[in-house]
Each structure stands twice: as C-alpha cells, then as structure tokens.
Amino acid sequence: MKSWKITPLGSGGLLLIEPPVYQDERGEFFESWNERVFAGLGIPVRFVQDNQSLSLRRGTLRGIHFQTGEFAQAKLIRCTSGAIQDAAVDLRKTSPDYLRVFTVDLSAENARMLFIPRGFGHGFLTLADQTIVQYKADAFYEPGSEGSIRWDDPTLGINWKLPQGMTPILSQKDAAAPYCYGA
C-alpha cells in the first residue's frame, strides 16, 4: 500500500502533501481529503468551507490574502486543472520564519497539495490557461477580518514565475493591496 508523503516547509506547520495516486487502464484515483489520515499525520483540522476559483488565463495572480484574529484560516490548497505557483507567507510575528515566503508548484498532473496553517498569507499565480484551484478552509470567510498584501511587495520579494515583461492579471482589489513595509 502506498503512503502519503509529507514535506515540512519551514518551522511553522506549512506542509507539502503528496497523496498516494493509484493508476490503472481507466486512469487514476487518489484521496484528496481524509480526516482520519490527516489527523494521523499530525494535521488535526476540521474544515468548514470549500472554495473554488477558475482563472481563465495564464498569468492571473490572486493574493496575497489572509484573515486575522478568531477568523484566521488554515487552508488545504490543490489545483484540479492547469497549474499554479502557490505562495504562502508566514505572518506570525513570533515565528522564526516571520515574513518568509514559501513557493511550490501545484498542478492537476502532480496532485500535490499545500496545507497552510493559520497565520499565513496566501496567493497564487496561474501557469496555464483554464486553471482551477480548490481549497478547504477551517474558518468561514469574514469580510471584516480579511487583509491583503500587494503581490510585488519588496519586503517579501516573491519570485513569481511571470514571463519577462508580463504584468499579471489582477483584480482591482489585489492591485490596490497595501505593501507590508516590513510589517
């Protein structure tokens, strides 16, 4: 029996998760969520909301988003169509990884997932047209506690995989996000 592969990123609970994928002549099968398995892997989380985004064009950038206080969210991110460069930023001021950025490529083909604990900001850049991202959250969306950081914040220095000279496709809200200035 195949096993789940878990790779810690940094010191704060951020995890790259690779589920066992079973393939045969029909295609493939894998579990993207199993509460017992995740608890056994040291990820005891209860998700309350599932979200999905469709980005029509390569170069679409969403984020960096987060929620604060009692509405902070842990998330499980996966890409079900296309591909993304996923970015998580540790925003916990007491963390040794404070303001450290972690990026991973997630795609429908590699079936990898990223578990992001509470206290992180999150964003992603689409690397293909028609990209679908699904994510689970352990707290409901609460507009009054949401925050964002500008995608090109120099303090974070995220090395987005944008082709030379390409400007990302942004929502008005993300384009107007503030810089963190070293928070």
Predicted regions and their residues:
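Non-catalytic, conserved peripheral segments adjacent to functional cores
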Residues: M1-N110, A128-Q130, A137-A183
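Short beta-strand His + acidic residue motifs that chelate non-heme Fe in jelly-roll/DSBH
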Residues: L114, H122-L127
